[in-house]
Curated annotation (Swiss-Prot):
GO terms for biological process: 'de novo' CTP biosynthetic process; pyrimidine nucleobase biosynthetic process. GO terms for cellular component: cytosol. Keywords: ATP-binding, Glutamine amidotransferase, Ligase, Magnesium, Metal-binding, Nucleotide-binding, Pyrimidine biosynthesis. This is CTP synthase. It holds the Pfam family GATase. ATP binds at residues 14-19, 71. Belongs to the CTP synthase family. Allosterically activated by GTP, when glutamine is the substrate; GTP has no effect on the reaction when ammonia is the substrate. The allosteric effector GTP functions by stabilizing the protein conformation that binds the tetrahedral intermediate(s) formed during glutamine hydrolysis. Inhibited by the product CTP, via allosteric rather than competitive inhibition. PROSITE patterns: GATASE_TYPE_1. It catalyses: UTP + L-glutamine + ATP + H2O = CTP + L-glutamate + ADP + phosphate + 2 H(+); L-glutamine + H2O = L-glutamate + NH4(+); UTP + NH4(+) + ATP = CTP + ADP + phosphate + 2 H(+). CTP binds at residues 13, 146-148, 186-191, 222. Residues 290-541 form the Glutamine amidotransferase type-1 domain. UTP binds at residues 13, 186-191, 222.
Length: 543
């Protein structure tokens, strides 16, 4: 039967619960166990799909099309399996389902309450996500003490009682602030955080204590005494040089052993040689490259979390230190392209809305005209098509209908609207073959033989994840191709453009999908590996 590890956080947010949970998941997986992971978010939004990246960070897309919290990305990068929409849910989804049940009369006229109706729905969803796993790690978003988290904490308390101590553990992540003036670590915030947790009926079995410096044994004893946690279960999580050191750090303090002993699981010792290889490659590069990421959310780099990690993975695969320069595309509009002129490669990521778009187009034009390696993703591909149409294909008014609904040259348009070769608007409703207005999740793409993309992937048909409403307009493809833009990949039905490249450019590649969502530190991703290699080659030939 599935065992449960409930992961909570205290003192402050952004301590790294997701990394800690994912690291423990990877340790248990390395012991031969089947692991499932679940993130429960206490916000009332149904999902993060409509939330500003500057508030929430990245929206991670699963293969089955769920728009989820960025922690799902950590889970997939650390645990070698794809998760689904069952592995992430929010307060909004729970309330939506309970209210829908009430409207149908499922509660037989009873008063609908947080307990038991909301908590029962939460427990039901936890069990669905855990189905078939040996161990399920369940992360509660937010911080203990937040009013929004209370229904989730009550639900995991109940579930812990229902399955019993032999099948449930509680792991609490806290901060131990170091006061430089006093020269000591303060344990009081952790004591109060655990006290808050115990007041609602949850006694932590494991404490993960984040700190800047190693804990003394006396400090561990003090924490154990005041929190009623075994001393051996007080785990010190230091600031790591790379997040991929964390599994080894936690393993050396016996975290996975605590779990297997508690659950009476007879499992082999974890082999972490693959993690050691990753860390060794990342911390001991043989060369370096400078890559400009030109976007509109650069004030919060969490908005590009998977993309940043994918570039790091490309560096790991090629023994290259990837130095990412975050360039605000609006600054390029105001100040010119001076900040990207000495870069070894340029990347324009996905995004929505017109703000900063002309800066992205300027960066793309610079990359194209100066033979700088370029990778465009989602909006980065659409703007590459717009730039090429304007400056090469003789279509100076080219634009996307997302950004200029009245454009006379819509080289990029909503999936449900197309301009044919005669300039006539073709409209399809959401029930037509092209689907709805948002294309989400894994889709197959057929690559053209002899193209750079085909060479990079080494496969005729690939599967990548999408999140977009707009596509390259088929009505302009003949003119774009005649000017030198190569359509190197299409959806398997041939209707939608998936990848483009410029044949007479050393390395100019763009894709409609998001390859960063399938990159992992141990296996990397062929597109990011090739991009980093191209940046390194450009550096060698120009500097």
């Amino acid at each position: 039967m599935t065992k449960f590890i409930f992961v909570t956080g205290g003192v402050v947010s952004s301590l790294g619960k997701g990394i800690a949970a994912a690291s423990l998941g990877s340790l248990l997986e390395a012991r031969g166990l089947k692991v499932s992971m679940l993130k429960m978010d206490p916000y009332i939004n149904v999902d993060p799909g409509t939330m500003s990246p500057l508030q929430h960070g990245e929206v991670f897309v699963t293969d089955d099309g769920a728009e989820t919290d960025l922690d799902l990305g950590h889970y997939e990068r650390f645990v070698q399996r794809n998760f689904t929409k069952r592995n992430s849910f929010s307060t909004g989804q729970v309330y939506e389902k309970v209210i829908r049940n009430e409207r149908r009369g499922d509660y037989l006229g009873g008063t609908v309450q947080v307990i038991p109706h909301i908590t029962d729905e939460i427990k039901h969803r936890i069990k669905l996500a855990a189905a078939g796993a040996d161990v399920a790690l369940v992360e509660v978003g937010g911080t203990v003490g937040d009013i929004e988290s209370l229904p989730f904490l009550e639900a995991i308390r109940q579930l812990g009682v229902e399955v019993g101590r032999d099948r449930a553990m509680f792991m609490h992540l806290t901060l131990l602030p170091y006061i430089a003036v006093a020269g000591e670590v303060k344990t009081k915030p952790t004591q109060h955080s655990v006290k808050e947790l115990r007041s609602i009926g949850i006694q932590p079995d494991i404490l993960i204590c984040r700190s800047e410096r190693p804990l003394e044994e006396s400090e561990k004893r003090k924490i154990a005494l005041f929190t009623n946690v075994e001393e051996k279960a007080v785990i010190n999580s230091l600031d790591a040089r790379t997040i991929y050191e964390v599994p080894r750090m936690l393993h050396e303090q016996g975290l996975d052993r605590l779990v297997t002993d508690r659950f009476r699981i007879d499992a082999p010792v974890a082999d972490l040689s693959d993690w050691d290889d990753v860390v060794q490659a990342q911390l001991n590069p043989e060369k370096s490259v400078e890559i400009a990421m030109v976007g509109k959310y650069v004030d919060l780099t969490e908005a590009y979390k998977s993309l940043i990690e994918a570039l790091i993975h490309g560096g790991i695969q090629t023994k290259t230190q990837v130095n990412i320069h975050y360039i605000d595309s609006e600054d390029l509009e105001k100040d010119g392209i001076g900040s990207i002129e000495k870069m070894d490669a340029i990347l324009v990521p996905g995004g929505f809305g017109e703000r900063g778009v002309e800066g992205k187009i300027a960066a793309i034009q610079f990359a194209r005209e100066n033979n700088v390696p370029y990778l465009g993703i989602c909006l980065g591909m659409q703007m590459a098509v717009v730039e090429f149409a304007r400056h090469v294909a003789g279509l100076p008014s080219a634009h996307s209908t997302e950004l200029d609904p009245k454009t006379k040259t819509p080289v990029v348009a909503l999936i449900t609207e197309w301009t044919d070769e005669n300039g006539q608007l073709v409209e399809r409703d959401e029930k037509a073959d092209l689907g709805g207005t948002m294309r989400l999740g894994g889709q197959s793409c057929a690559l053209v033989e002899g193209s750079k993309m085909r060479d990079i992937y080494g496969e005729d048909v690939i599967r990548e994840r999408h999140r977009h409403r707009y596509e390259v307009n088929d009505g302009y493809i003949a003119k774009l191709e005649a000017a030198g833009l190569k359509i190197s990949g299409r959806s398997e039905d041939g209707n939608l453009v998936e990848t483009v490249e410029i044949e007479d450019h050393p390395w100019f590649v763009a894709c409609q999908f998001h390859p960063e969502f399938t990159s992992t530190p141990r296996n990397g991703h062929p597109l990011f590996k090739a991009f980093v290699e191209a940046a390194s080659q450009h550096k060698q030939t120009t500097h």
